[in-house]
């Protein structure tokens, strides 16, 4: 007899694999061999990114062998009732994360249009989907019932929508399931359109399988057979030779064993009959989980021989009895039943099966039942009030400050044997992204006020102003012994709406309503603080530089520019304390659609804004209000001379625990590098820079810091550089390198003067060539001699590796670099150092002397303005984040197909379901060209809701294709983020549904959670731990 707790069980739901999932970006093969001139930094650190591999792919598929004529005739009729269900759970809810998937169902009422499938297909939360019949007719489906416990649900479709085939329904005959019966499982196995798998029923009295932390069925027996079904077969009918459905495919083993688990159809048949009659499907509970235990185990628990004899005489074929497994605290049976009680009678009726117990409880909601159990050989009779199972199953949720919340469900309570009470975080995002876990938190209090249920939580959140920092107390459902306490930053500006969603079983949708407008932020108050003092540090300069460091935390409400994270924390260097200017790595502040918090002296937290983003050299300049900081912040003194190889220096950095470390060391090398491009999704990277490495192991452990001299002058910044994502493990590489401060000074001086630097750059990426290579490529001996004299420490020139795709409006007739050009001079200045390329910043055109194909030539090379390189607009449509191709895209592509670039997409959205993947360009909507976001917005606004439309797209590798997408304005309304300096956050959010959102503010839906988005075609969302 199997007990509950089958670790190898897996539900048969397939991840979506539509034909629209085309190759979007070819990964380069990983190799340790460097390309010519490659100077990739060698000290990259790899960070784990979750790899969600579908274990169901490991299952063998067991197709049916040649069938008899009777079986063939049966199957021909059955397949006309089987449908392929393609669906999304549009946001995380209860045990399920937002996702897109496909499964199977079958028609059980052709006249009224009812389809039976699994509960984990119908989804506990918002569902959106359609079904495809055997003749490939498509029809929308909506949920009309999902059972609170058992793994079945009922969908409804419009029978009139099926015009080209006669609808057939399968008769449910649960009593036909017998041990030894030959069966067929007819469904979409492994995502295929139709698979027919054969098997033989081996057991009828198996306990329901446990699927782990997610949804699991209980309080029912399951049927076991060997059919080797795989992902996508969830909801398949299990039919006998008479063509009757005798069970419902639900799950199986994921360890390679050809074992499948079927749900008996007794309770689905009752629910269907209630729905047909227009009656509610009543479900009763005493909040107790029962399991089947064989008689030998029951005897050990205290079943007396007399009662065993009575049971065996009354039910000669039975070999097991029901035993209490879990009694929930504060439930009707709490303090009355105990674990291990053997159930004998309910209301005076002897029973040994779940079906009869369910029948009694479902017909006794609100009434009292009498239970007779044996406990240690003693008869114990108790009375329990039967509760309503639907009342403890969440049918509403609230989204606020980026997170999604509902009352704790009976499913979760049963799994962890806790009371069905509390506020459950089903989408831990935005302000409520706690300890880097996406869901599973129970919020005990917010702002020192208890939140025992969702209503109390809403009342507390109504009173908290925007940008407030409040204390929350919480526990994770998997570790209720440990209570966590955190300070969270309440975001009601990126997420202004507090919205209530309520399930509507009449429409199959969840109805949204606004609960409260945000309270404006309180004016900031100046604070006092002192910096720590380093004990035992022999270098006075290191002790002094502490006053120039601040901690920078950047939170992004939306994934843009291919950046993989929603939050990043590190340290910045104060370069002007009077003006509040801080230099920080661009791997921490990648773009300005963000919230930046600066922590001074580990005590004062102030907001900051982006002042400048360098397009090439991996630093950002941010600014906080210094009047709010009453602390002895010190402006760092920056060196004006470049640090040299072999020079002694003091390394001051911050380790992974954000603790300061100091080491006296020396510069080992200064190498011209470009951070490797990310193949799966272009994102910002530093190019054409001199990277400094030092002789200390601390350098690899610290992502931020400085190199300083004995006089306390900062010789270099120590920055983290976001690198590529490895194709095998889907892990991001981060490099830690030094950046000489003299390269920072020209830009910084302009910012200090209140002038916004308007840099111009050369539209290319270069790498170093040595003189041996240069000679072979046609550089004359005269020039080689000049190089050796101009740069005695490094005899090198620069070769053009890649010419960026020019921005719109660029003069295509102008001279440009070509790949392979060797640059000798720019405006007459010999170029042998990266810093000498800075001449490009101020000039519209440069006269370049180059060697091309072995010949020297002069060309007039135009520079490119950087004002348009940063993203200033994003359109969110059907769950896809669309933007103008950012700089990293232009660096890696040779031709821009349009200015509508897919930057990211949300799980559970139409873009995810239909395969509109990141790194694609959209060139037309319904045949109308859409060269830019304005034209795109204009065309898609004409499309009615719930209607298919065609998108012509081009992959990053120039492969054109067409994808059809169905619009969904209810769950994924179109909205925009537009840069607007008049707004406090620098951006404003606009809704395109003016009738529905008259205030123009886009709805704050859980599907805009950046942690639920993927920015690369590999589909991996970043969940790297970011300790606070």
UniProtKB/Swiss-Prot annotation:
Pfam families: PDZ_1, PDZ_6, Trypsin_2. Residues 1-49, 983-1028 are annotated as: Disordered. Residues 289-374, 876-957 form the PDZ domain. Its EC number is 3.4.21.-. It is an enzyme of class 3 (hydrolase). Gene3D superfamilies: 2.30.42.10, 2.40.10.120. GO terms for biological process: apoptotic process; proteolysis. Its main location: nucleus. The keyword Transferase does not apply. It is found in: Nucleus. The active site is at residues 120, 151, 233. GO terms for cellular component: nucleus. Nuclear serine protease which mediates apoptosis. Belongs to the peptidase S1C family. This is Pro-apoptotic serine protease nma111. It comes from Aspergillus niger (strain ATCC MYA-4892 / CBS 513.88 / FGSC A1513). The lineage of its organism: Eukaryota, Fungi, Dikarya, Ascomycota, Pezizomycotina.
